[in-house]
């Protein structure tokens, strides 16, 4: 599945656009698939912030706010917000409640007990 990601950086009026390609179609997504998509969104955000930097080797799903929201043209989008930027990916042909549950499980599974930052 190809997902368009629109990235908005704080203090910058330009909207950056990236494409994420994920091999699994949404109907078969697991929390692991959604975690991979969320991490790809965060890597795309890092690239927009500093195009010359190498991609982050490790990305953790914490310190961000997220929401699943209906898309104007059908389906839903995943929106992430971190301190310095926000990103929206989609649309995804899936019920909002289903994707919300997958995101919740993906973020919970990525938590590492005992690790603060």
List the model feature ranges, each with a label:
Residues 1-117:
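Positively charged, low-complexity terminal tracts
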């Amino acid at each position: 599945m190809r997902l368009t990601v629109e990235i908005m950086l704080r203090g910058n009026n330009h909207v950056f656009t990236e494409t994420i390609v994920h091999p699994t179609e949404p109907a078969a997504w697991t929390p692991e698939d959604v975690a991979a998509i969320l991490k790809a969104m965060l890597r795309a955000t890092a690239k927009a912030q500093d195009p010359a930097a190498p991609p982050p080797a490790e990305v953790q799903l914490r310190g961000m706010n997220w929401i699943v929201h209906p898309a104007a043209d059908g389906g839903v989008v995943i929106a992430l917000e971190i301190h310095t930027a926000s990103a929206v990916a989609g649309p995804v042909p899936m019920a909002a409640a289903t994707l919300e549950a997958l995101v919740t499980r993906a973020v919970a599974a990525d938590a590492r007990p005992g690790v603060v930052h």
